[in-house]
Swiss-Prot record:
SUPFAM superfamilies: Glyceraldehyde-3-phosphate dehydrogenase-like, C-terminal domain (SSF55347), NAD(P)-binding Rossmann-fold domains (SSF51735). This is 4-hydroxy-tetrahydrodipicolinate reductase. InterPro entries: DapB_C, DapB_N, DapB_N_CS, DHDPR_bac, NAD(P)-bd_dom_sf. It is found in: Cytoplasm. GO terms for cellular component: cytosol. Catalyzes the conversion of 4-hydroxy-tetrahydrodipicolinate (HTPA) to tetrahydrodipicolinate. It comes from Syntrophobacter fumaroxidans (strain DSM 10017 / MPOB). Its EC number is 1.17.1.8. Belongs to the DapB family. It catalyses: (S)-2,3,4,5-tetrahydrodipicolinate + NAD(+) + H2O = (2S,4S)-4-hydroxy-2,3,4,5-tetrahydrodipicolinate + NADH + H(+); (S)-2,3,4,5-tetrahydrodipicolinate + NADP(+) + H2O = (2S,4S)-4-hydroxy-2,3,4,5-tetrahydrodipicolinate + NADPH + H(+). Pathway: Amino-acid biosynthesis; L-lysine biosynthesis via DAP pathway; (S)-tetrahydrodipicolinate from L-aspartate: step 4/4. The keyword Amino-acid biosynthesis applies.
Length: 267
């Protein structure tokens, strides 16, 4: 039985992951924590996520749960997730991280820390989106330079980072397939008299509003035709179930940094 703790257990993703862990065979909820001062701290976990009593209280620090768990699932913020990985790696505990907004230097540190423990980091853990990553790469390679690539993403009004980690990954996949460097060709906003679109641009545009769970459209626009590939998430359960699948997988792996393509056997 895999024993799991959930970071940010009172949040939208954290609470749903915790709920689904309790419904999934082979894994049990063994802890949950929030940042110091959060109103959920010291409350029974079931008061936060619902269901029958767990016998566990929400703690205020990852260190308070590490001794009793095998893996930590973390959908918080990039800086918090990196600090949690520092502590988990020092104690030999696996991690699954779905936080987005990592800077390059943060990802570089995460890769070094993953030399001590197995860790899955992915901006999106749904099966559909990970298939989308592969499809976009394949389509970009097939169409080549004659089609322009544009990515549009939409999320709920409370999402803090933009563009989404998924949109950035889609852009990176397309850029890689076309032999481009996203840092050089990515365009994140257009306004005013900007002139003609350059041939190498990859556009990434952001929408925020309402309670949109997540929507990503990748457009390949050519002369006289275009292809649009769309993924719409209708529930956070897709992400939560993917994270649990990753947790069950990662505890059996050697130290290293993995993605959902590894978990799903796509790489």
């Amino acid at each position: 039985m895999v024993r799991a703790a959930v970071a940010g257990i009172a949040g939208r993703m954290g609470s749903r992951i915790a709920q689904l862990i309790r419904e999934t065979d082979g894994i049990e909820l063994a802890g949950g924590f929030e940042h110091s001062g959060h109103q959920a701290v010291n409350r029974e976990i079931s008061e936060i996520i619902g269901g029958s009593p767990t016998g566990l209280k929400v703690t205020s620090h990852i260190a308070q749960v590490l001794d009793t768990v095998d893996v930590v699932l973390d959908f918080t913020l990039a800086a918090a997730s990196l600090e949690h990985l520092r502590q988990a790696s020092a104690r030999g505990k696996a991690m699954v991280i779905g936080s987005t907004g990592f800077a390059r230097e943060q990802l570089e540190e995460a890769e070094k820390l993953a030399g001590r423990v197995p860790c899955v980091i992915s901006p999106n853990m749904s099966m559909g989106v990970n298939v989308l990553f592969k499809v976009v790469g394949d389509v970009a390679r097939l169409l080549g330079e004659s089609f322009d690539v544009e990515i549009i993403e939409a999320h709920h009004r409370l999402k803090k980072d933009a563009p989404s980690g998924t949109a950035l990954k889609l852009a990176q996949v397309a850029a890689g397939a076309l032999g481009r460097n996203l840092e050089e060709v990515g365009v994140y906003a257009r306004r005013g008299l900007i002139g003609e679109r350059t041939g190498n641009e990859i556009g990434i545009q952001t929408i925020r509003g309402g309670d949109i769970v997540g929507e990503h459209t990748v457009m390949f626009a050519g002369s006289g035709e275009r292809i649009e590939i769309v993924h719409r998430a209708q529930s956070r359960d897709n992400f939560a179930r993917g994270a649990i699948r990753a947790a069950l997988w990662v505890v059996r792996q050697p130290p290293g940094l993995y993605g959902m393509d590894h978990v799903l056997g796509m790489k």
